[in-house]
Amino acid sequence: MRRWWLAALCALVLLFGAAGAEAAEVLQVRSGTLLQVGDHNRTYTVELACVAIPEGGNPAATEWLRAALPRRTKVNLRPVGNDGGTLVARVQRLGSADAAIGSDLGSGLIAAGLASPKPSC
């Protein structure tokens, strides 16, 4: 009986965990933490989750993100919240042979020394 409950719980976690991921296409990199993405006939402003950039922005972070996410790049969004109408999500690049694909772009900015992790994450 216990194994059955454990199997059912694992199945639910896998089912709902996968439902949180949505593929989208990058339309524009607005700043070091803000993207404009499209999903069929809708567009979203997406803020990278768990990443902090100094007030006034960081031009090097914006350029890094533009190089990592050219227009029409497919991305996977893992929503973590909403901030005044802006979707806050972990963003992963999809569909390329590049070694950095699949890694969280916020973590990439932090590893490059262009951003710092938010204390709340």
Where are the predicted features?
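Small beta-barrel nucleic-acid-binding modules, primarily SNase/OB-fold domains
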Residues: 2-6, 17-121
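Classic N-terminal secretory signal peptides
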Residues: 9-15
